């Protein structure tokens, strides 16, 4: 068996183990002789939190020839989708979700995100225009705006903004970013938002406010990346 066949077999064996857990396959093993960290095999798989993620400890060879280990985090169900980050414009304003983040011990203001199987499948098939409200992982946003507002909401456009690595150092996670424009009944929206500053977990910001809050209220990498991608796209449109 040639060296190439051996490497192909090794990659196939590793990817089969990942596939059995619904994890995203490796694209390549890397080659130490070319200055890359080369994957030799799987040492351990830690799936104690597999509902959300799985950590895979790989045996590796470093460019200097020494061998060791490197742990990579994979998204749950990453074989199907690494999730979606949705820049949602409600009647032209950015929908921002306020929520408690246990790991930070604080409230944050974020762009909505969730599991995006239907979005990713539609993108691959070139069928984004066929999506319905129920196909979007709107989560808190939909709950907070309420059935009265969302019942007649209309998707006017869905644009794929790109796939951006979450943490290229340790995570094999590359979520999709989308710009979703929703039109809702303005009177119903005003009624829902009126006097809601203290209890409603959804804020609607104009473009100026969204830009101003980058690095301030918007302080997570998903949200900052999403707003940057969306504003670049919006500014590229013909006027």
Where are these regions (language model features)?
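A short coil-to-beta-strand element that immediately follows conserved catalytic motifs
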Residues: 152-161
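Active-site-adjacent beta-strand/loop module that shapes the phosphate/pyrophosphate-binding cleft
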Residues: 59-64, 167-188
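Nudix hydrolase/Nudix homology domain
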Residues: 2-28, 35, 104-119, 123, ...
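A short, amphipathic edge element
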Residues: 27-47
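Acidic, metal-coordinating catalytic segment for phosphate/diphosphate chemistry
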Residues: 43-90, 99
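Conserved Nudix-box catalytic region and its N-terminal flanking loop in Nudix hydrolases
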Residues: 73, 78-143, 165, 196
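Short, well-ordered beta-strand micro-motif
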Residues: 57-59, 88, 179-181, 204-206
């Amino acid at each position: 068996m040639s060296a190439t066949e051996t490497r192909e077999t090794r990659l196939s064996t590793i990817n089969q183990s990942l596939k059995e857990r619904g994890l995203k396959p490796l694209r390549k093993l890397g080659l130490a002789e070319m200055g890359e960290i080369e994957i030799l095999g799987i040492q351990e798989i830690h799936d104690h939190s597999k509902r959300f993620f799985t950590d895979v400890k790989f045996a590796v060879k470093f460019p200097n020839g020494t061998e060791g280990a490197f742990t990579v985090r994979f998204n749950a169900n990453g074989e199907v989708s690494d999730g979606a980050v949705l820049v949602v414009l409600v009647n032209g304003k950015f929908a921002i979700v306020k929520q408690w983040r246990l790991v930070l011990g604080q409230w944050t203001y974020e762009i909505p995100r969730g599991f995006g199987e239907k979005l990713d499948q539609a993108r691959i098939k070139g069928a984004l225009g066929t999506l319905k409200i129920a196909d979007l992982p709107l989560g808190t946003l939909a709950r907070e705006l309420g059935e009265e507002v969302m019942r007649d909401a209309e998707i006017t456009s869905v644009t794929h903004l790109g796939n951006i690595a979450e943490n290229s150092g340790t995570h094999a996670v590359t979520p999709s970013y989308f710009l979703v424009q929703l039109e809702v009944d303005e009177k119903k929206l005003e009624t829902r938002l009126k006097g809601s500053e203290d209890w409603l977990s959804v804020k609607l910001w104009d473009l100026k406010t969204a830009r101003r809050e980058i690095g301030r209220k918007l302080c997570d990498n998903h949200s900052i990346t999403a707003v940057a991608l969306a504003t670049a796209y919006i500014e590229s449109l013909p006027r």
